[in-house]
Amino acid sequence: MRLLRVATCNLNQWAMDFDTNLRNVKESIARAKAAGAAVRVGPELELTGYGCEDHFLEQDTAAHAWECLKDILSGGYTDGILCSIGMPVIFKSVRYNCQVFCLNSKIVMIRPKISLANDGNYREFRWFSAWTFKDALVDFQLPLDISEVTSQDTVPFGYGFIQFLDVSLASETCEELFTANAPRIDLALNGVEVFVNASGSHHQLRKLSLRIDSMRNATLACGGVYMYANQQGCDGGRLYYDGCCCIAVNGDVVAQGSQFSLKDVEVLDALVDLDAVSSYRASVSSFREQASHRTKVPFVKVPYKLCKPFQSGMVPTGPVEVMYHRPEEEIAFGPSCWLWDYLRRSRASGFLLPLSGGADSSSVAAIVGCMCQLVVKDIENGDEQVKADAMRIGQYKDGEFPKDSRELAKRLFYTVYMGTENSSEGTRSRAKMLAEEIGSFHLDVPIDSIVSALLSLFERLTGKRPRYKVDGGSNTENLGLQNIQARIRMVLAFMMASLMPWVHNKSGFYLVLGSSNVDEGLRGYLTKYDCSSADINPIGSVSKQDLRAFLRWAAVHLHYSSLAEVEAAPPTAELEPIRADYNQLDEVDMGMTYEELSIYGRLRKIFRCGPVSMFQNLCHRWCGTLSPSEVADKVKHFFKYYAINRHKMTVLTPSYHAESYSPEDNRFDLRQFLYNARWPYQFRKIDELVQDMDKDGKWVNSTEGELRRRKGVRSAEGGGMGVVAVGSANPSAGS
């Protein structure tokens, strides 16, 4: 029985902070060695941090990575343990994303990434080149200062594996796990038993199962041990790397790390039986047949043993049940951890949130409350780094530290209700109640006097005073009056964030939190430079439907019972006067429901639909419920306001990335911001399709469709994408 103890890790790295990154790498190696591991793998580009972006183009970045590696090699950290360490390497003036394998203070091999990630949030081709030479390993000339430490002039560089006396090992890097022609296939057929994967994979709602299933299926098809490492935390941008380091053997997960955590270092180890891998493969006739005429892969021979001799009491680690968080938990824990990293690394003293009492701002408040709960829990569990950060941020003195989440929230979280004559008592009381449950320092600030002062100034300048629509004003006046209130709140929020610490004799500044959701961004249902303009936004990529589910969950599990009332209230901006016969509602203003918006967003981004293909898709999905002309009106209405408001996305607050149909303009959803909002060609094609469908007479309401329409039943067909949009607002409405 060949037994091998292996270790993987989650590391909370910070792009370009080499001190922090090096410290975490060293700590993870030390913990792996203490556990008796013979192999340790860390995250992708762990020495620099994955999110360096254009800093990768600087020679300094690669040079500093080599300096950090020299520190590791000269410090004896790799003595007795094979370490896979991620860093950028420049070879013949070309930059590669590499795993450097080190053992006993020497470099065994450098393995460049062969399949780069270049979609969604990833832009690896901007900074790196893929290694395309698979026939042979080449010699890499080491930097002189590294040669002095390792006593090596050159080391093998390229695609291949490492053959030890008792085990063969190779690597895949992040994206290569998901490619159609994955490296592990040829490697497994060449006898490689252990695969290490250094990853820089970010969180997205409902995404973890894809990652876990890929590892399971990889080792189920080919057999083997798969070690997966990942970053965890905010390393300086919109992404939260969600850890979940794990180890899989022959299709079973035998160890799984946390997906969301405040820890800087988490190490996971397992004792694996390599003979079980050999036995598994030998039992599959198709594997034996394919291995007999395999494509040979180059390798490096290392005369060293990694396995432990069998002793009584040594039992291979058995399978575990994989832990998946519910989407509501993902919304709670992912943004909470992201906010904590941002807070401690920005050196801010806390957060300020304009709390309106509505679903969006209440969700953000609950997330901050959840963050405070996580901090106190980790302190109770003995995390000294979290404790030190919390003491500094909360400005505790004389050895005091946070022991209660509400007390911590009082120190680092301001909430402000900025009401006007258009605000209701319901939202005011809900905001106050939630603030009390969380423990924030809450202020109720009326802003009518500021609004009145601006309107008086405008009247002196122009001789005119705008009126609300309910008072006989035009749409232009009505929108202008709403925007004044919204923008005053933004200015006041930033003023209070900078000055309230001074008022309370505290040092530092507060970060302003935004609370617009992904659907409002997609539709443009927000005022440019209102409270959607903030320092950061933890829910900017979360849908309204998911937020409402989160509110229901948080009311129970975070013990903020007032959130149940918040969730039950209809969404409203409260920017227009309330009358007996009129109450402003979001979905009426937008001319579409949030549910419809979610569908439009998924079709536009995930399924890459333009106006015509979206119309065709929705005609199929809403067959028997809406006529072709009704579907056409809805599609045109969406694309009209999407185009008109697209410019707002260019200045939207940096938001936590959570949703696959996010319209975030920075890198995820790159589009122009000046459109012909009439879409003349596309809309004409839709009109032609409607005429053809009406002419053919084939659009017949089915009995099933009629029943759905009468009952308002939502269709689950099409992977949950079909929805019966019964009772949606007038498509000609909107602002």
Swiss-Prot record:
* MF (Gene Ontology): ATP binding; glutaminase activity; NAD+ synthase (glutamine-hydrolyzing) activity
Q: InterPro entries from the entry?
A: C-N_Hydrolase, C-N_Hydrolase_sf, Gln-dep_NAD_synthase, NAD/GMP_synthase, NAD_synthase, Rossmann-like_a/b/a_fold
What SUPFAM superfamilies does this protein's entry cite? Adenine nucleotide alpha hydrolases-like (SSF52402), Carbon-nitrogen hydrolase (SSF56317)
What is a single Pfam family found in this protein's UniProt entry? NAD_synthase
Family membership: In the C-terminal section; belongs to the NAD synthetase family.
In the Enzyme Commission scheme, what number(s) does this protein have? 6.3.5.1
Protein name per the record: Glutamine-dependent NAD(+) synthetase
**Any Gene Ontology biological process:** NAD biosynthetic process
